[in-house]
């Protein structure tokens, strides 16, 4: 039986390898993708006359340089600024505007609580435990000092925030209609991880000494002893398995937005169309019109010209135009 448990020792290496390879593949694929158009999404105008004052908020909303575009991405990543500004993304029946700042609040609570939880778990992988981990754990449980063990707020906050985010996808008609199975799958994984972790800490107590020995064996690449494996709690094995599966699943899910946002042209491109010409990287010779270099192929015939005049257009689509004329087809006003 103990030999079969060694699968749990190999599991994190397999899942982490899938995560690294998958993440590198997605990042390289995004980095190599050409951006044929300049499409920064802005809510402020470009710089114009010097006497037109632009605040630092305007510079973030409409970045005119790569530096301010980078600052804008930082605000998006760490403060979820776009989500905070998305206050009226749809209107309910009756003309009532729907404020979505609750979505921003619970989203930022979930992500930062999860970050604190991950940092707190470093105590299982280090010996001795770093002081900053001890300090963070103390601050996290400062409101639950009267409870043994102290109630760590981030675990509860993360679970409540996850319940809101998942309930929103289930209960709201608009969100339910655009949600796909993979959206619910990753939320299910996170729910199992959080619930099993809270159960181990407060209700079904697991022997954390064996958990730490197992964790240290994983990070030091030294297989644990059969005694350590035999004494791992079944709930910990469930918790650990879902953590590994989630890590391996990240490159194939929407969770990759943590890396994809850095490559989003609507966010990382400066809004400087008036000052700099954006050359289409797919266009090998931008000085010549595409009609001269490559032409347009219609029905197997390629037409090349300096400009698309009426005679060339009629020659290209003569058959279709004749067919329309034969059927005496005319557009009605309501069809526009």
Curated annotation (Swiss-Prot):
It holds the Pfam family Nitrate_red_gam. The keyword Cell membrane applies. Gene3D superfamilies: Transmembrane di-heme cytochromes, Chain C. InterPro entries: DsrM (IPR047660), Heme-iron_electron_transfer (IPR051936), NarG-like_domain (IPR023234), NarG-like_sf (IPR036197). Keywords: Cell membrane, Electron transport, Membrane, Oxidoreductase, Transmembrane, Transmembrane helix, Transport. GO terms for molecular function: electron transfer activity; heme binding; nitrate reductase activity. The keyword Ribonucleoprotein does not apply. The chain crosses the membrane at residues 4-24, 60-80, 102-122, 145-165, 184-204, 232-252. GO terms for cellular component: plasma membrane. It comes from the Archaea. It is a multi-pass membrane protein. It is found in: Cell membrane. PANTHER family: NITRATE REDUCTASE PRIVATE CHAPERONE, REDOX ENZYME MATURATION PROTEIN REMP FAMILY, RESPIRATORY NITRATE REDUCTASE 1 GAMMA CHAIN. Has menaquinol-oxidizing activity. The HmeC and HmeD subunits may together mediate electron transfer from menaquinol to an unidentified electron acceptor on the cytoplasmic side of the membrane. This is Hdr-like menaquinol oxidoreductase cytochrome b-like subunit. It comes from Archaeoglobus profundus (strain DSM 5631 / JCM 9629 / NBRC 100127 / Av18). The gene is hmeC.
């Amino acid at each position: 039986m103990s030999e079969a448990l060694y699968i749990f020792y190999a599991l994190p290496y397999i899942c982490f390898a899938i995560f690294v390879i998958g993440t590198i593949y997605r990042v390289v694929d995004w980095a190599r993708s050409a951006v044929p158009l300049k499409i920064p999404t802005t809510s402020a105008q470009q710089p114009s006359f010097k006497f037109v004052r632009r605040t630092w908020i305007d510079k973030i909303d409409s970045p005119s340089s790569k530096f301010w575009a980078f600052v804008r991405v930082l605000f998006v990543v760490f403060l979820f600024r776009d989500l905070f500004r998305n206050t009226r993304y749809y209107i309910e029946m009756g003309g009532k505007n729907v404020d979505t700042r609750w979505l921003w609040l619970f989203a930022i609570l979930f992500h930062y609580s999860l970050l604190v939880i991950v940092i707190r778990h470093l105590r299982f992988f280090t010996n001795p435990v770093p002081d900053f981990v001890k300090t963070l754990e103390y601050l996290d449980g400062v409101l639950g000092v009267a409870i043994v063990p102290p109630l760590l707020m981030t675990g509860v906050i993360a679970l409540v925030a996850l319940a809101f985010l998942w309930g929103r996808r289930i209960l709201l008609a608009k969100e339910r209609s655009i949600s796909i199975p993979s959206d619910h799958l990753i939320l299910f994984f996170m729910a199992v991880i959080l619930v099993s972790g809270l159960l181990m800490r407060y209700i079904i107590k697991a022997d954390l000494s064996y958990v730490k020995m197992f964790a240290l064996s994983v990070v030091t690449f030294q297989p644990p002893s059969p005694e350590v494996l035999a004494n791992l709690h079944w709930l910990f094995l469930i918790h650990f398995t879902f953590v590994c599966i989630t890590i391996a699943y990240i490159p194939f899910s929407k969770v990759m937005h943590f890396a994809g946002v850095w490559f989003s042209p609507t966010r990382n491109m400066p809004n400087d169309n008036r000052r700099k010409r954006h050359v289409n990287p797919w266009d090998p010779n931008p000085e010549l019109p595409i009609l001269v270099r490559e032409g347009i192929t219609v029905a197997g015939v390629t037409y090349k010209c300096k400009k698309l005049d009426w005679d060339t257009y009629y020659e290209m689509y003569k058959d279709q135009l004749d067919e329309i004329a034969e059927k005496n087809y005319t557009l009605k006003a309501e069809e526009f």
